[in-house]
Swiss-Prot record:
Annotated gene: GNAT5
Residues annotated for acetyl-CoA binding in this entry: M218, T219, V220, R226, R227, G228, I229, G230, W231, D258, E259, A260, Y265
Family annotation (Gene3D superfamilies): 3.40.630.30
Location in or out of the cell: Plastid, Chloroplast
Transit peptide: 1-55
Entry protein name: GCN5-related N-acetyltransferase 5, chloroplastic
Catalytic reactions on record: an N-terminal L-alpha-aminoacyl-[protein] + acetyl-CoA = N-terminal N(alpha)-acetyl-L-alpha-aminoacyl-[protein] + CoA + H(+); L-lysyl-[protein] + acetyl-CoA = N(6)-acetyl-L-lysyl-[protein] + CoA + H(+); N-terminal L-alanyl-[protein] + acetyl-CoA = N-terminal N(alpha)-acetyl-L-alanyl-[protein] + CoA + H(+); N-terminal L-seryl-[protein] + acetyl-CoA = N-terminal N(alpha)-acetyl-L-seryl-[protein] + CoA + H(+)
Species this chain originates from: Arabidopsis thaliana (Mouse-ear cress)
Amino acid sequence: MAALSISLAFSVDSLKPTQSTKFGFSSSSHRYPLLYSCKSHRSNLRFAFPPSSVSTATETGEENSKSTGNYAFLEESFRTGRFLSNDELEKLKTLEGFAYFQELESGSMWVRVMRHEEMDSTVHLLAESFGESMLLPSGYQSVLRFLIKQYLIERREVLPHAVTLVGFFRKKVDEFSDDGEEEAVMAGTVEVCLEKRGANASPPSPTPPKESPYICNMTVKEDLRRRGIGWHLLKASEELISQISPSKDVYLHCRMVDEAPFNMYKKAGYEVVKTDTVLVLLMLQRRKHLMRKKLLPLCTNPIVEMVGSDNELTSSANV
């Protein structure tokens, strides 16, 4: 059973029953239809409202063209509906074009930012894994899905300061098989807090610095574990942090009882900086390590390691 890193902004204890390679795309890919192409735009942009929110005060044609040009480059999933600074818009463009691709022994996978239409699938994936790690009965799944969806909606409002990534996997087809190409499926997800404005209001203990990037809520679909997917979710998160965040100290949590994830994080370069006291047991929580890694400067051709077990890649927070 894989542990799940979860740091939702509500207590789930009440639900218990009583007891690397960066792959940049400049055009559409028929092989990986779920990847979006990244377009280059140069503009002094200041807000990202959808068309219905743009002022209709257009006494001149020049005013109208100026307004529509300010949001047109962003896909609907990245339009926040609030005024943004130029720096925030540049980060949104980076998120929109971010893609991480890796060939695995059993197939191929890629990671990018979650789109709005993928929220329900992501909620279902998180609810399954979190319910599994908490040993919750199936009757609690609908409540858990509702709470997780509300959490994801709230987290999307802080884009581009925090982001949810999703990973897709396509199984390798035997060259001698007559079957067509396998359909890509959502295989995992992970949340990345990039800076203080994206930090969770109620982070698990030990508390990580709010100004530093933080990786959490990582999970891999149960029937796709032990393929290296979780490892590359972690590597994709680190690569995105290297591109956007000025801070290179990355934090995450790992439960003390999760020996395999702990060993994996150690291998990935994370070190324990603080550990929960026994007092957290009084709150019916597992003791956790807070771990930190200092990222190296982003290189143009990073060497990506292959790891065979996803069970070693999940971490846990307030469970």
